[in-house]
Amino acid sequence: MQVTFFRCGGVALGTAMHHFVIDGRSAFHFIQTWASIARGDASAIVPPSLDRTPLRARSPPTVLFDHSREYRLTAAAASPAPAVASGAKSPEYASAILHVTGAQAAALRARAAGGAPRVSTFRALVSHVWRCACSARALPDDAQSRLYTMVDMRARLAPPLPDAYFGNAVVRTSASARVGDLLAAANGLGFGARRLRAATAQGDGYARSVVDHLETAEMARGGGLPGTDLRVISWMGMPSHDADFGWGELALLAPALMYYAGFVYLMSCPGKAGDVAVAVALEPDCMARFKELFFEEMAAAM
């Protein structure tokens, strides 16, 4: 961690945490607890649940789903795929943080639903980002695009984990679509939203299968994405702006870096109910067009 004090009186606090140890919800729990201690408010501290046994692998491990896309095997385990060169740098990217108002998010939800049951802000907004990225990248209609995301399994396990479970309780999942189908005017936002709903509707059986897969598979180090794909991380609904170290409310909370092109974060905005900040990294020659499409399509939905 690093703390930087500015002459203007502002303070920047940076942290680095390993995803093998904790997920986003646990990371914000840690920061909230740290802030409570710093300002001397012990009453606000919620003790963490440190029991990891609910997420033990089964004996014997029973893998019921194909997790090979979401959890890549090492070159040795996935032969004959070529190994990634050690120390290889990720491709260059441009990044931006785009602001979506509560009214704009509501309009996207309505357009994605199209008269069907309610669509969540996450699914509507991610479908919008997915379509804009495919268009900005000028992908051909017959290309396959895959969108990776994560699901918090705390409430979906049987029995559910405690709310204060401290560890990594998210699993990776993904949705794929033919670009032509994703962008077809007749399909609209609802097509991608339905694909996302199917991908994120996983329950206890899927989570147990992931744990057993990780118990037996030799995993590869992280890397970039193909130019057709996206990886979306959502911090919406998390207590990301509740950390008061005694300096007052946060002015900004954001990822310090975006890793590689195709990475997207969704974040709630402090003090603005329903507003969402979208942090996105794309190939430099695609970013300007992505921004145009992002706001043009959103205006058309209003």
Regions found by a protein language model. Give the residues of each.
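Soluble acyl-CoA-dependent acyltransferase catalytic core bearing the H(X)4D motif
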Residues: M1-D229, W235-G237
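Low-complexity, glycine/alanine/valine/leucine- and proline-rich hydrophobic stretches
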Residues: L225-M302
